[in-house]
Amino acid sequence: MINNRVRVAVTGAAGQIGYALVFRIASGQMFGPNTEVELNLLELEPALPSLEGVAMELDDCAFPLLKRIVCTADLNKAMDGVNWALLVGSVPRKQGMERSDLLQINGGIFTKQGQAINDYASDDVRVFVVGNPCNTNCLIAMNHAKDVPSDRFYAMTTLDELRARTQLAKKAGVDITAVTQMTIWGNHSATQYPDFYNAKINGTSAAQVINDETWLKETFVSTVQQRGAAVIKARGSSSAASAANAIITGVNHLVTDTPAGESFSMCRRSKGEYGVDEGLIFSFPCRREHGELKVVENLEFNDFGRERFNTTLNELRSERDTVKSLGLLD
């Protein structure tokens, strides 16, 4: 029984992630079988012919839940009346580019997107940032959407969490469903901390089940941190299908109450939890309870965990300070 309709903006919709994503949204995998979908697809002007091809394919799938497709290069039109803004598109880092260059280029993009969301999106809009560097891009967009409550902005560490769960399951020789409470702390970058001490395998600490601290501290952590680069090296381009899958999973987490005993990783605006500076977009362990997103409290760190936590926190502080110095934050 159809009981809802949602309008979704996807930026960079003709890119590899967008192409892997939009069909899954239209099929009902993101919002469920009882929610009709309208897609507002945004691309740069030169990519509009390719985007029209994506729209043709969406039509040809004859998805019963897909009720409307808008293809546009007009940011304001793309954000008009949307309930969800999936900010997938961003400028990738190129050889010889400093991180500050990347932050400045994308800062301009996400400034405009935040303003358009503020002025044109639905009053209940939620914003899910994927384009990298996603934590700080999310911070910039949030800063320029003053009328949208800050707790409606999220950035994605879902792919990192899924990568980490898979590595633990393989090492322990268990099914992927046995691995729970796998937290990614901090930044979606090579400083992220995949917290194997607080992760569970069949309800027991992963560090106890695997009992190979050298592998966990060195191989596991670095594999998760560097997985994106490894995919690029292997296939010649960045993660696309797995990123799209993680977007589906991440939004599922945000629209569905979390089962008892489970949690998920999500970047959200800090309110000071775990000593993180208020206002930073930081990945925490989260639960959705009765429609409200909450950070899981009272997890503990040993010296190794605290050091990794502080490293990723300091990187996010540095990114914030950089974009502030560039005039991208108030």
From Swiss-Prot:
- Catalytic residues per the record? 188
Secretion signal, residue range per the UniProt entry:
none
GO molecular function, a single term: L-malate dehydrogenase (NAD+) activity
Question: What's the domain of life for this entry?
Answer: Bacteria
- Name residues in a coiled coil: none
Entry keywords, A to Z:
NAD, Oxidoreductase, Tricarboxylic acid cycle
Q: Which Gene3D superfamilies match?
A: Lactate dehydrogenase/glycoside hydrolase, family 4, C-terminal (3.90.110.10), NAD(P)-binding Rossmann-like Domain (3.40.50.720)
Instruction: Give the Enzyme Commission number.
Output: 1.1.1.37
List of residues binding substrate: 93, 99, 132, 163
Q: Which residues bind NAD(+)?
A: 12-18, 106, 113, 130-132
Pfam families, alphabetized: Ldh_1_C, Ldh_1_N
Q: What does this protein do?
A: Catalyzes the reversible oxidation of malate to oxaloacetate.
Family assignment? Belongs to the LDH/MDH superfamily. MDH type 2 family.
Q: Which HAMAP family match?
A: Malate_dehydrog_2
Name of the featured protein: Malate dehydrogenase
**Organism (species):** Legionella pneumophila (strain Corby)
